[in-house]
Amino acid sequence: MEELSEIPDDGITIFSAHGISEKVENEAKNRNLKFFDATCPLVSKVHKEVIRFADAGKDIIMIGHKNHPEVEGTLGRFPENSSGQMYLVENILQAEILKVNQPENLCLVTQTTLSVSDTEEIVLKLKEKFPMLQEPKSEDICYATQNRQDAVKQLALESDLILVVGSENSSNSTRLKELAENCGVKSFLVDDPEKISSINLEGVKIMGITAGASAPEELVQQMVSKCSTLGYKVNQEISGLKEEVFFKLPAELR
């Protein structure tokens, strides 16, 4: 569901890892909805930074994709009574023409699912324009996003074609597809195993498969099974960086 108004009064609500705005949270509380906040701790950390910067009267630039759930939630954490302003920058062109009220009192946050390489050029341009800009901490970036992108670059060295399991409206899945193509490898975004049959696989001897952050493991395995029916064998699983970061479940679910 996209709106709280769609949820009945006796419904149980789970807020996604993308996070929510203060307005949405207050609406849920005012309706006495039973809800579980599954916001990613990295996103919550950025929310707290936005509130802290705003309380200090600073201007804030956020690098991210307009209308992305995480971005909407983070922008919605900026207090209306702050003396500062918050600005969204999506690309380097917007960075070049951006004007702020307090160039000497300016902070930067980013959408957590954008890797360092995704934002590098924009950050450089902003630092060039605003030398006093306070940069975000590297630990604010989703480690899983960076690891997946690094793994795709490695996978591209060994594959004739790469399937990215994920939906077209997933920004991190789309980015994986773009990275594979930038490495000179044909890449397709698929969210249904049956769609693989419509892809031209002529000359494709080695097929690589990766997945966006929100793609369930079950769907990935269905893709692998479908490829097996097309004559492809699972030869190896590339071992990327071992992730050893674990987050606790919300207290209500423990």
Can you name each region flagged by the protein language model?
Residues 1-211, 217-254:
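The feature marks the mature, well-folded catalytic cores of soluble enzymes
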